[in-house]
A protein has these predicted regions:
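Conserved phosphate- and dinucleotide-binding cores of soluble alpha/beta proteins
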Residues: 2, 12, 19-24, 30, ...
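Conserved SAM/SAH-binding loop
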Residues: 104
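HTH-adjacent hinge/linker in prokaryotic transcriptional regulators
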Residues: 2-29, 34-100, 108-116, 120, ...
Length: 239
């Protein structure tokens, strides 16, 4: 098993248990205690976990902004699976809004070099990777959020308002039981709302860690979008 796969599995376990011993992780990840300790040291450096004597606890990321570099490492295998299926929904010649979420960032890996699409994004990471693939991309500009490398604010919103996309792909931090999609970042929520208003079809990408959670700022409700793709069955819910 590769290191990233082990770390992803450890995070899966901690999302369920919150705390686990080294011996427990070694048994369920099928790796030695030495390997587990090495992985946990790396995960602690990334701000994903807190190590303690003989065990580890999942870092509490509720109600605070989590930097993109940390979100990129969290549940990466699941995000890649969702991203791969999301990309399969894109038709040639489409114009697409992509937000700055880590799940959407994974989508770029599955786009072909020189694919015949046009992307509008407020994410510098997304824009840079698309340029490397020689895919047409518009970056909205605006005030840069260092932790997320996304552009926000009125300049960004004005550009989004001036454009129309066939598709929008986005994620957020929470999907409550009553269908509210929400996030802790006010500025990124505003960007997503603008994109939602100017896209013909909207896709919400959601893994199980987001289910049952609610944050301060509401992006939209599931009744406001056309499709959402979620972990496990990847069920597509049509409005």
């Amino acid at each position: 098993m590769f290191k990233t796969e082990r770390m992803d599995l450890i995070l899966e376990i901690l999302h369920e248990k919150k705390h686990a011993t080294i011996d427990y992780l070694s048994k369920h990840v099928f790796a030695s205690n030495v390997t587990i300790r090495r992985d946990l040291k790396k995960m602690e450096d990334l701000g994903l976990v807190i190590r303690s004597y003989g065990g580890v606890t999942l870092m509490d990321t509720e109600n605070k902004y989590v930097p993109l570099i940390i979100r990129e490492q969290d549940r990466i295998s699941v995000k890649n699976q969702i991203a791969r299926q999301a990309v399969s929904l894109i038709s040639e010649g489409s114009t697409i809004f992509l937000d700055g979420s880590s799940t959407v960032l994974c989508m770029v890996n599955y786009l072909r070099d020189e694919q015949n699409i046009t992307v509008i994004t407020n994410s510098l990471r997304v824009a840079t990777r698309l340029c490397e693939k020689r895919i047409d991309v518009y970056c909205t500009g605006g005030k840069l959020v260092p932790e997320a490398l996304v552009c926000v604010g009125p300049y960004s919103e004005t550009m989004i308002e001036s454009m129309t996309a066939d598709l929008m792909f986005f994620s957020s931090q929470g999907l409550s039981a009553d269908g509210k999609i929400s996030d802790f970042s006010e500025s990124e929520t505003c960007q997503r709302r603008q994109m939602l208003q100017h896209a013909r079809k909207r896709y919400f990408l959601c893994d199980s860690s987001k289910l049952g959670k609610s944050f301060l700022f509401t992006v939209c409700r599931t009744s406001d979008i056309d499709v959402y793709k979620r972990q496990v069955s990847y069920r597509m819910r049509m409005r």
